[in-house]
Structure formats: C-alpha cells, structure tokens
A protein has these predicted regions:
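Active-site-proximal alpha-helix that buttresses catalytic centers in soluble enzyme cores
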Residues: 3-83, 125
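Generic beta-sheet signal
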Residues: 4, 100-109
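Short, solvent-exposed coil/turn elements at secondary-structure transition points
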Residues: 10, 83-85, 136, 141
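Glycine-rich phosphate-binding loop signature in dinucleotide/nucleotide-binding domains
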Residues: 44-46, 98-103
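Hydrophobic packing residues within well-ordered alpha-helices of enzyme cores
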Residues: 62-66, 91, 117-118
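Short phosphate-binding loop-to-helix
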Residues: 82-99
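Domain-level recognition of soluble alpha/beta enzyme cores
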Residues: 122-151
Length: 151
C-alpha cells in the first residue's frame, strides 16, 4: 500500500501588475500556514519519503518550510517543472515515474489540479477544494505509483 499526500502551497502575496504568477512569494500568513501544516503532518505521522514540488516561488518556499519543520534531508525534496499548474493527467504521469521503494509521496502544488486529482482518486473527496496549505491523504493500492497513469 502506498500513501499520497496532496498539499496545496501556502498563501502567497498578490502578483504585481507586471509580475509573473510563478514569482509570487509566500505572505507572512502563508509562512504561518506552512508551519501549521507541518505540525499537523507530524502529529498524524505523515512524514513523506519523498516530496515533489512545482518551481513556482510559493511552492518552493512552502516545500522548504515543510522540509525544515519535518527534519527531512534536501534529497527528499525535488522540484519538477511539469508540476506548475499541472492538470490531474500531468500529476498522474509524474507520480507514475516514482520508484516503488517510495511508500509515502507528497506533491506540493496548485489548484485546481490537486483538488481535481484528489476527487479522482477517492470518491469521498468529491467536491474537495484544497485551501492554502491544506492537504489530503490518500491510500493507493493495486499496482502502486505506476498504476496511477492507467486510471
């Protein structure tokens, strides 16, 4: 049995009129949200073997705050360009590449893709909309990570 944690990035500052969405940094509120998410993950024993995150500043910063709070090494966190504003199909394709030795995987990314994937993976999560720094925890049976690309 594999476990997947889908975590939306924490709250970010608004983009400047001429700025890029991907350059938005976490707000003070977002930094507090990320710390609270880390505490909740720790309290539930949900420490990932591996975490993948999008290259957007807000997801990188969320990932770094989580990594530090969870006491995980740098190599346990990887940036993946395709995760930026990824659709459920792209998320599934990326997850399917994960080595079978990884039992608990975390994806730190964006809505609507994360919330839509959560709905696809677990009917109980229908109409779920992840809030900033919110997460869902899903058990993955069957063929493991590779099986997600076939669903």
């Amino acid at each position: 049995m594999r476990e997947l944690i889908l975590l939306r990035h924490a709250h970010a500052d608004a983009a400047p009129l001429e700025g890029n969405d991907s350059d938005r940094s976490l707000s003070a509120r977002g930094r507090a949200e990320a710390s609270l998410a880390a505490a909740r993950l720790l309290a539930r024993g949900l420490v990932p073997d591996l975490a993948l995150f999008s290259p957007a500043a807000r997801t990188r910063e969320t990932a770094e705050l989580l990594r530090t709070a969870l006491g995980l090494p740098l190599q346990a966190f990887r940036e993946l360009a395709p995760l930026y504003l990824a659709t459920p199909a792209v998320l599934r394709a990326q997850i399917a590449t994960i080595d079978a030795a990884t039992h608990r995987l975390m994806i730190i990314g964006h809505n609507p893709g994360l919330s839509e994937l959560a709905e696809e993976l677990d009917p109980k999560l229908r109409h779920t909309v992840l809030v900033n720094a919110g997460y869902v925890h899903v058990s993955i049976g069957g063929a493991g990570w590779r099986g997600l690309s076939e669903a």
